[in-house]
Amino acid sequence: MRRKFLVAFALVFSAGCSILGGMAEREKIYGKSGPVITASFASKQVGGGDDWLVYINASDPDGDMDQIFASVEFQAGVDHPYPISITKIKPDQGKNLSGYLHLGTPDLDRPINITLNLQIRDKAGHFSAPVYFRVNIFDQSRKKGKTAQESPPPGVFQEKDLGPIMIILTTEVG
């Protein structure tokens, strides 16, 4: 599944290269530094039907962070293709970014596990190293008595909504 994720990134990157010129040309305009995700956090469990919050801090010395790419790997043994979600980064956050993305989770009759992969791309076409988050989405019958998802460490992340992760999770296969 990670291979599919990387192939999809390569295709998106190739399309960007053909439209905007080569990497050297874009680096002349936007700079040679790439984005770095400096801190990240997400709760390891969330109740079905709740929004899962994924916190990130990132920086780029050139100030040209442009998009957040997200993909989902379903629980082991289930090969369900999900699209890649692309969230635009606001220009005032191109140098330093802090906040959370949110992924809607389905109401469930059984728990599922997913892995979320995140990367940031800048306008020159550089990608950050990926970060991975595993989460258990538990069903409504087990939700009673469970606490809300974990909060991030205090003082590390801004409580700023960076946007939704536009992937609709489903438990249906095929």
Positions of predicted regions on the chain:
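Short, solvent-exposed loop/linker segments at the N-terminal edge
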Residues: 44-49
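Extracellular acidic, Ser/Thr/Pro-rich low-complexity tracts
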Residues: 57-63
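Surface-exposed, short loops/turns at beta-strand junctions within beta-sandwich domains
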Residues: 105-112
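Short beta-strand elements
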Residues: 126-171
